[in-house]
Each structure stands twice: as C-alpha cells, then as structure tokens.
C-alpha cells in the first residue's frame, strides 16, 4: 500500500522492488542458515539482526525519496536492507525457535503463535497509522527492534555441551561439505519442488492489499479495512498455530504439507473467481488455516528425513531460499499480469501452478513411515560428519 499510494509506484515497479528484495534474501539465506547451524544455540546472528531492525525507522524514512529519484538504485538498496533484515532474518529466528523447541520438548507452533499475535497487533495499529502518517509505522518498527534486542539479551540458553549431546554431534563440527551433501539427496529435491509451488503464496500476498483496497469507494477506507482484515487473519493464524501441531501429529508431516498446499491453491484460485470485499476477505482468511499447517509440517518433515544438525540450513535454503528464487522470478511477471490483464486472471494462473506442484509432490515426497532412524541422522565417527543417505 505504501509503495503504491504514497510513493506512487506502478505494479511493475513494485514487482521490481520485491524481486530485488527476494534476490538479496536468496544470497543471504544459505549463509545465515549455515552460520546459525554452526552457532547452535548461540545468539550472535540474532543480535546482528536485532541491530538491523532498530535501523528500520531511519532507513524507510529516506527510502521513499530514493525511489522517486531512481527506482533502480532504490530497488538495490531496498533489496539489501529488507532482504537481509526481514526476509532472511525471520527464517533465522523461526529455525532458532524450532531448534529450542526440540531440545526443550515443546511444540514449535505454541511458541510461533506469539509471533502471530505480535504481527496481528502490529498490522491493526499500522492500518490506522497509514491513514494518519505512514512514518509513524517506521518509528514503531525501530522501537520494536529495541524491545527485541533487550529480550534477546535477557534470553537464557542451554549450555553448549547439553545441546551437543541432544543433537548427536557438535554443530561447530559441521562443514560446507555437510551442507552441500544435501544437494545429492533426491528427497531434498522433492522437497524443493514442493516449496516451488507453495511459495507462490508470497507473490500473491505482495500486492494483495492493492487489490483489496480497490474494492472500496475510497482508498482510505480500503486501507483501513485491510488493516482490520489482516489483523483478524493473523489472530486466527495464532489460534491455528496452537491447534496445528495436534492435526499434523495426527495426519503426518507429508499429509500436512499436501493439505496446506491444497488450501493455498483454493485460496489463490478463489480470489480470482469471487467478487466483492466480503468473499475476497473469506479467501484471504484461508491463509490462517494454511500457514500454521505448512510451518509445523515443514519443520517436522525436515527433522524426520534429514540431519537435525542442519535444521537452519534446511529451512533457510529448502524453504526460505527457494521462496526467494521463485519470488525473484515471478514478482515482475505478476506485476506485469496485474497491469495488463488484471488481478483475477493472474491469480487463476498462480493457483493452477500450485495445483500442479501439489499433485507432483503427492508422489515425490517421502511418507512418514520412511523417516530416518534416529541413529542414522548423523555418522558418529571420529570426524562427526553427516553422511548422505
């Protein structure tokens, strides 16, 4: 909304910016993942991200002027900052939380639920602020970064030796070859194919606020209503994060992935078929069903079928990084489609792509019954290196 209504960019230009953000995130995510796997439970990388979050206010206050001056330079700078801070940084935080949940013995979804509640509160307030002064949101972002840094400094973690015993080998013993060995595993590429389809939801979400706001008599009313809708969605998502672990444990990680992908396809295709703000809102709210199941299932699937020491690398490369690649390629095409054909036909094409990858994934993803035995996750020889299976 801010890029379109306040900076004055067209959908194609907005797609260029999102493409740059995704490209930078693509480069940062594998690096972040491997670094965090090496760090284990140490918070060094999270502290760096916290400092970048604090700088979000000053950055965005000058970002609009840079974009109006030169869209290409602005896209590069925006890609560097947003890609490294938010798009790549959120994956580090989520994988860190999931790693702690495995060690401490609680469900990841119950911790992630609080992130959804925070997002819901932020979007509710931002929906009001953007009609008053969008800069208020940027100041709030920096304040939130300060709070995150304080909480991170107060967070107590396990001793490294306890972590090493639980993870069947020291994270510091990981090498680049351990991470690269993933590329030789057919099951890794099957996971990549699934993610290629499901990450289309991020491209769908990028300019959905513009589409939704256009359904109302005035853009101001549309902005405010979108803030309410987004807040409701994320509050429902938080509830879904609490319930999703029970469902995924019942149906299995693979079936959970396929269910989330099916809901996603229905949501995107439905957005292209229905008319009016009420029905479009219903399609948007399906995200609250889809995302909790997807996140819980992807972490459970990774822990069942891959070396657990590489959990951050798997999530940031196998999920976040692939999402960035697809977003880099599809964001400009989606922007072109919105400008020349409209939102509805473009959504139909996106939804059909998700249907195709879902059907292929139903065949290629490994069943829970083929999960690796605990002792096969790593080779506990003197070198303590993970072996491809």
Listing of model-derived features with the role each one plays in the protein:
Residues 1-6, 80-81, 183-204, 285-289, ...:
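Pair of pore-lining "gating" transmembrane helices in MFS-fold secondary transporters
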Residues 309-340:
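A late C-terminal transmembrane helix in Major Facilitator Superfamily
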Residues 156-192, 217-218, 381-388:
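Juxtamembrane intracellular "pre-TM" segments in multi-pass secondary transporters
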Residues 137-154, 345-364:
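Symmetry-related core transmembrane helices of the 12-TM Major Facilitator Superfamily/SLC fold
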Residues 51-69, 263-275:
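C-terminal ends and interior cores of transmembrane alpha-helices
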Residues 86-102, 293-307:
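Intracellular juxtamembrane helix-capping segments at the cytosolic ends
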Residues 1-13, 206-226:
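Short amphipathic helix-loop junctions that connect adjacent transmembrane helices
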Residues 27-41, 130, 240-253, 338-339:
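Helix-to-loop junctions at the C-terminal end of transmembrane segments
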